[in-house]
Amino acid sequence: MSNNNISTLSSVTISELLDAGIHYGHKASRWNPKMAPYIYGKRDDVHIINLDYTVSQIDVISKVIYKEIKEKNGRILFVDTRRHRDIVAQYAENCGQYYVTHRWLGGMLTNWVTVSKAINKLDQLEKKLADPEKIVGYTKREILSMQRMRDNLHRSFGGIRNMGGKPTLLIVMDINKDHIAVKEARREKIPIIAIVDTNSDPDLVDYPIPGNDDAIRSIRLYCKIFSDAVLLAIEHMLAASGVDLGAINGDNPSERLKAAKKITKMKLSKKVTKINVEQDQNKLEKDNKDL
């Protein structure tokens, strides 16, 4: 794709969606009538989703994600507390975003002060346990207790510890399972992108994607699409700063992203230094004229 061209941001095809099983809904008896516009028909008492709508929505949502990062410098939070958690966490990390995949704790969005305190506690425990001198005098039992607390906090808050504030966009894989996350985001007026299966209410989210929300292949494809949109936005942002993300060595997008950010910081630092030197030189010339 050419820089800053998002007209063809998502190139996913109906064939790819079919291969991932995204067209399979739930049993007809479990359907939500609000999903009727997105249902193609039934097969063996299972609803089949009309993938024309899915492709169209994926294109729209890819652009929403792209703009959220590039134009708003936003923070995107991926949510999936089911068995797919490792896939979701991996893709979120690879594109430099955030995730909750262990358990959604009530107040994660509506009580950010308490969440921040928990994250600070996690940071303190990690620093303490990493320094042998700081745990001198503690019994083995006390150290084990601190380790368990650290592990519990990491499971709950590790994916959002560096978020630096509430997310500006939520991506939810199953709005029925993670309904509390949806409820809190709506209360906080945080836009929601979500997969809506045939048993879901599409009216609960801002950007619904009709599709299977259970199959591992489906979740992997969704995450790849979302992650690609984020990475493209970051690539264009870095390109505007003179950094070519594609030219940085490494197979892992996350590592390349970190390297690119480091280069950007160095460039900005040099730019600030150059400005300061020029200012000092101008001041010196002015002082010489005054003499």
From Swiss-Prot:
GO terms for molecular function: structural constituent of ribosome. One of its GO terms (biological process) is translation. Keywords: Ribonucleoprotein, Ribosomal protein. The keyword Methyltransferase does not apply. GO terms for cellular component: small ribosomal subunit. InterPro entries: Ribosomal_uS2 (IPR001865), Ribosomal_uS2_bac/mit/plastid (IPR005706), Ribosomal_uS2_CS (IPR018130), Ribosomal_uS2_flav_dom_sf (IPR023591). Gene3D superfamilies: Glucose-6-phosphate isomerase like protein, domain 1, Helix hairpin bin. PROSITE patterns: RIBOSOMAL_S2_2. CDD domains: RPS2. NCBIfam families: rpsB_bact. Belongs to the universal ribosomal protein uS2 family. This is Small ribosomal subunit protein uS2. The gene is rpsB.
